[in-house]
UniProtKB/Swiss-Prot annotation:
Phosphorylated. GO terms for biological process: cytoplasmic translational elongation; response to cold. Residues 92-102 have a biased composition (Basic and acidic residues). This is Large ribosomal subunit protein P2y. It holds the Pfam family Ribosomal_60s. It comes from Arabidopsis thaliana. Plays an important role in the elongation step of protein synthesis. Residues 63-115 are annotated as: Disordered. The lineage of its organism: Eukaryota, Viridiplantae, Streptophyta, Embryophyta, Tracheophyta.
Length: 115
């Protein structure tokens, strides 16, 4: 994400087609490190594309991704357990929460940003 942010800053500063050096300069100014391969991949993917169109396409893709609502059910079932069995259900819900956290990662959610 920091490479994308640096690219956007370069475009907003007036560079119509930022180079790898431009992005490295921006990232270096804040002490951020990145791999050259990430920068080159981004530049290859956005080459010849309009920034406004890329942002609009990204918004459309994000709008199709379902969000929220899943965690509330587990919390409600854990808190609704009565009396003596409450301890066991609380332990089960903690295990479920840990599993869910591992599943959530910085993957591409099934789509590419630049398609």
């Amino acid at each position: 994400m920091k490479v994308v942010a640096a690219y956007l800053l370069a475009v907003l500063s007036g560079k119509a087609s930022p180079t790898s050096a431009d992005i490295k300069t921006i990232l270096g100014s804040v002490g951020a490190e990145t791999e050259d391969s990430q920068i080159e991949l981004l530049l290859k993917e956005v080459k010849g594309k309009d920034l406004a169109e890329l942002i609009a396409a990204g918004r459309e893709k994000l709008a199709s991704v379902p969000s929220g609502g899943g965690g509330g059910v587990a919390v409600a079932s854990a808190t609704s357990g009565g009396g003596g069995g409450g301890g066991a259900s609380a332990a089960e819900s903690k295990k479920e929460e840990k599993k869910e956290e591992k599943e959530e990662s910085d993957d591409d959610m099934g789509f590419s940003l630049f398609e």
